[in-house]
Amino acid sequence: MSYHYQMNNNNTDFFDSANYIPQMQMHHGYQDFYASDSTSSMPSSGTTQQALQQTENGIIQGQNGSDHGVAFHFRAYGGWRQHDWNSTSSWSIGNQLEMENGTLTMSHGATNDGNIRNNQQMMTSNHITTDSFRQIPPSGLCYMDPTPSLRLPKKEPLPVQRPMARSTPKPFRCQTCGKAFSQAANLTAHKRIHTGEKPFMCPVCNRPFSQSSSLVTHRRTHTGERPYPCAQCEKAFTDSSTLTKHLRTHTGHKPYVCSICMMKFTQSGNLHRHMKTHK
């Protein structure tokens, strides 16, 4: 919704208490202001200097004596804000207006109205701005760029919060050895170790396997497929676990340590064979 307020030619007071809220909404929202008064439409800088006159008490008046319409027009476009209003019917601008090259400059030099409290100044240096008026259409519509201090601050992106590491519950437990699993399918495959069941048969050599993944790896020995090559040498392997073991020969990593003599090994099978020497 837009608020359009026009200047009156009958010297109507724009700053009575009934119009205070719509006026402040218009200031903060940067709505369009239509100046129907010929003294406040400001078609050019030359005519503006002729149309505006500053009286001795600081109130700017037009040539026809309409002070409130012109004062309201420049309060709206000058970026002025109210801090203390003791009188809504009598308000003095108390500032000088200068027009240079189409730019309206407001300089804080005159005195404020006597009804304004001394300990709360109506204007400060931060309120005095210089606003460049763009080309004014024939209808008298004025435009003003938003004051930088009134623009909404940019919201900083929220930091990405990674979920906390949680231990996966393992509700499926083997009744033979007590080993627990997170999925029932893993427990079923594990039970075949105890029962010796091997339902997966190789169609080439009829070799049975307890898990389907073991059958897939075995069939690569017949096809010659080796999808896991080593980046350090020219060797390739049929499964990823064999490649991991091979890479330790290049890096020298030996994660398996004997608890008796502290001897290290690259593979767990080598550690098991070594432990038999201590018995």
Curated annotation (Swiss-Prot):
**GO terms for MF:** DNA-binding transcription activator activity, RNA polymerase II-specific; RNA polymerase II cis-regulatory region sequence-specific DNA binding; RNA polymerase II transcription regulatory region sequence-specific DNA binding; sequence-specific DNA binding; zinc ion binding
Q: What are the start-end ranges of the zinc fingers (C2H2-type)?
A: 172-194, 200-222, 228-250, 256-278
Q: Which InterPro entries match?
A: Znf_C2H2_sf, Znf_C2H2_type
Which Gene Ontology cellular component terms are annotated?
nucleus
Q: Name one Pfam family in it.
A: zf-C2H2
Ordered alphabetically, the record's keywords are: Activator, Chemotaxis, DNA-binding, Metal-binding, Nucleus, Repeat, Transcription, Transcription regulation, Zinc, Zinc-finger
GO BP annotations, alphabetical order: chemosensory behavior; chemotaxis; neuron differentiation; positive regulation of chemotaxis; positive regulation of transcription by RNA polymerase II; regulation of chemotaxis; regulation of transcription by RNA polymerase II; response to alkaline pH
On tissue specificity, the annotation reads: Expressed in ASE chemosensory neurons and in some other neurons.
Kindly indicate where the leader peptide sits in this chain: none
Subcellular location(s): the record lists:
Nucleus
What SMART domains does the annotation carry?
ZnF_C2H2
What SUPFAM superfamilies does the database record attribute to this sequence?
beta-beta-alpha zinc fingers (SSF57667)
Can you tell which superkingdom this protein's organism belongs to? Eukaryota
Using the UniProt record, give the first listed, main subcellular location: nucleus
Q: Summarize the protein's role.
A: Transcription factor essential for the identity of ASE chemosensory neurons. Acts by activating expression of genes that are specific for ASE chemosensory neurons, such as seven-transmembrane receptors or guanylate cyclase. Also required to control the left/right asymmetry in ASE chemosensory neurons by regulating expression of genes such as cog-1 and ceh-36.
Q: What is this protein called?
A: Transcription factor che-1
- The record lists the organism as Caenorhabditis elegans
